[in-house]
């Protein structure tokens, strides 16, 4: 392991000890924001410290095994060779783990997200598929212990949604869903197709980190235009009789957000403002990424909505992620929310890309 990496790890261990001490101080305990932030930092540092302790122990085991090779007892020498082999394997594995821990961390990984799904080409079938995607993400969220709430929805004429915007909140939501942005294509025979022909439709997905208040996304009240309108009811039930739905336009950028699913105008306005801040935060993130032109383009894609990232082929029961050439013949499981078999390879590919970038520096 390079000396620079060891020095970085040592500084993290010292910081872990410092944070541990701070968390027991009365002044920190009484300040909820500081206590929360330090608790998060501690939870990030804890696995690094544990891995480094294992690494240090493996180095000691290796040294002890080397010394045993000089023994005259043949049985002890054989035992030493086996222990040396195990120690070298452990060192190699732990060095890889520690390198990944040291990768630059996305500051938004812990954020909640706004998930936008829009029907694209394909008419009614695209709307139906957007509904299928929303169910898929809802089931995945449930499996992860996350919560999901609908912010705004425009239903399709024959089912599904022309557009649905939801908020997903829980632990590490953005870290797992950030690679879902892009165009999702479906190939299947629609229920209305009498000739049995396969149709191709598409939906676009956008995943945006929710802007935290501490991130300082300030919006000048003079820069926004707020309109109220009557929320549409579902199937004629609970139709809103008042103009409680909110549409906010951010005049400098032209960004428009709507919210109509909360019970009051006040709640709809708060949700719409939160979504607007997240859109402006995402725009800032996109701008920064474009400015970093010298940085290698991520193998898992730019997150551009127009970029086709995945195909769901129903006749073959196949899902293909085009960014990493991953093909799985488990479409039914994926649509039931078993997304880890796709998401984890994307995360690993992203980590490998970052490691390659670090080695080039």
UniProtKB/Swiss-Prot annotation:
Gene3D superfamilies: 3.30.160.20, 3.30.70.1660, 6.10.140.1950. Methylated by PrmC. Methylation increases the termination efficiency of RF1. The keyword Transcription does not apply. It holds the Pfam family RF-1. Its main location: cytoplasm. InterPro entries: PCRF, Pep_chain_release_fac_I, Pep_chain_release_fac_I_sf, Prokaryotic/Mito_RF, RF-1. Disulfide bonds: none annotated. Residues 287-313 are annotated as: Disordered. GO terms for molecular function: translation release factor activity, codon specific. It is found in: Cytoplasm. Residues 287-297 have a biased composition (Basic and acidic residues). The keyword Isomerase does not apply. Peptide chain release factor 1 directs the termination of translation in response to the peptide chain termination codons UAG and UAA. This is Peptide chain release factor 1. It comes from Francisella tularensis subsp. tularensis (strain SCHU S4 / Schu 4).
